[in-house]
Amino acid sequence: MNFWNFLEILLFIGIVAAGLIVAVMIKTAEDTTLFDRTQLPEDNPQKLNYYVQPPPNGDEKVPFPTVFEPAKVYTTFVVPAYNEEKRIPKMLDETVEYLKSREAKDKSFTWEIVVVNDGSKDKTKEVVLNYAKDYPNIFLLNQPVNMGKGAAIQAGCLHARGELVLMVDADGATKINEFEALETEIKKLMKNNNQAIVVGSRAQNEKANRTPIRKFLGLGMHVLIVLSGVRGIHDTQCGFKLFSREACKMLFMNQHVQRWCFDPELLVIGRRLGMKISEIPVEWNEIEGSKMKISGMIKMAIDLIDIAIFHRVGAWTIRDRRINK
């Protein structure tokens, strides 16, 4: 085999490899968003249906409203939950206590908690339904199979009734009273733009209690996040973010990333749509059992590469009109 034949073989292998990579990328880019799957006709087997299942309706399944309908309450608290039967009771107790206290001081302060059960294998669903028996403001949105934290947040926000929508983790790492700081900030932003996002930041608060290893890994991930297109945000991954209803309408029907790294994509979409985005410090403490495995970080890195490529080349298009369904 001479040199030129060797080069031809290398070129052929390179073309085949490139073709496979492009094919995979195109397939990934063509995947519909969760929003698209909720809009499919009733007889389509891929259609996603979400139901609220609290008593006193018994076993009756009641369809959720959508974020495209008029708001019914002041704030929706969206809580993604996967195998959280042990941790979510404490979080719900603290949240309900805070919300009832606010409600007692201000009758116009209306609220709901939407817990999105993301295919839990434990008793998370039953625990939440028990709370729903006592509190008509608590709803269960059930995903029969695990689809990822991003999918859970997306589903909850697409079906929120609130004028404001807060995503908050089930582990209670950020205390719910930090909501007031985000609430004050988003009201300032909404004076000039009703599409607004406020990001809770652990990086800006010295009270954030993280181990050195977590800080180091977080720094490496932040470099990838910047490359994905996020600008001006120090901490994209804190599970405490507040959205205006108008922002929710645009963000979550365009979200593609379904698992851990959905937050940067939301910020990329918001930036491209000219939304007002702000970041403020929150008190946050690392909770036992909240650590991410190395395999999870690798998947996050892949998601960030997808965001950087697909949004830049237009494979993931952003719909810039409201869709009322």
UniProtKB/Swiss-Prot annotation:
It catalyses: a di-trans,poly-cis-dolichyl phosphate + UDP-alpha-D-glucose = a di-trans,poly-cis-dolichyl beta-D-glucosyl phosphate + UDP. Its EC number is 2.4.1.117. GO terms for cellular component: endoplasmic reticulum membrane. One of its GO terms (biological process) is protein N-linked glycosylation. It comes from the Eukaryota. It is a single-pass membrane protein. Pathway: Protein modification; protein glycosylation. Signal peptide: none annotated. Residues 1-5 are lumenal. It is found in: Endoplasmic reticulum membrane. Dolichyl-phosphate beta-glucosyltransferase involved in the glycosylation of glycoproteins through the synthesis of dolichyl beta-D-glucosyl phosphate which serves as a sugar donor for transfer of three glucose residues to the Man-9-GlcNAc-2-PP-dolichol precursor to N-glycans. This is Dolichyl-phosphate beta-glucosyltransferase ALG5E. The lineage of its organism: Eukaryota, Metamonada, Parabasalia, Trichomonadida, Trichomonadidae.
